[in-house]
């Protein structure tokens, strides 16, 4: 049976769509969508996957792993070298929560809007 659905887009809530899109563009190499503006910005991968960022008034960033402000979304990215990727992403504006449950297998970081994401080895 062929798949019923095909993932074409992922959209994250945030306070500043353009700033969050800039972070992910530098981190992933996705291309900025020409229709991006201050309320909704997007990035497109070569195969068409769209990553969107929408402005939400009163946005409250997740405080992972605090369940009172849950993670709201979760992205996983594979990398060749955890330490190198973490260093570059921190320079780009990512954060590193104190709680790290993955040991040497994965790292949890947060984007500039507070969304947690994981880096895992290829």
Predicted regions and their residues:
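A detector for short, charged/polar N-terminal pre-domain segments
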Residues: 1-2, 65
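Core segments of cupin and vicinal oxygen chelate
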Residues: 2-5, 11-57, 84-87, 91-105
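Active-site beta-strand termini and strand-to-loop segments that position acidic
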Residues: 43-47, 109-112, 121-122
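A short, acidic/glycine-rich surface segment
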Residues: 58-64
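Mid-chain, well-packed structural core segment of small domains
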Residues: 67-89
């Amino acid at each position: 049976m062929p798949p019923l659905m095909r993932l074409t887009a992922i959209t994250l809530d945030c306070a500043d769509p353009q700033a969050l899109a800039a972070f992910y563009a530098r981190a992933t190499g996705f291309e900025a969508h020409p229709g991006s503006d201050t309320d909704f910005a997007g990035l497109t991968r070569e195969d068409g996957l769209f990553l969107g960022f929408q402005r939400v008034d009163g946005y409250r960033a997740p405080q992972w792993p605090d369940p009172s402000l849950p993670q709201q979304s979760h992205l996983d990215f594979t990398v060749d070298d955890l330490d190198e990727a973490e260093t570059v992403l921190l320079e780009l504006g990512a954060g590193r929560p104190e709680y790290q449950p993955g040991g040497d297998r994965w790292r949890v970081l947060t984007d500039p809007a507070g969304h947690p994401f994981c880096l895992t080895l290829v």
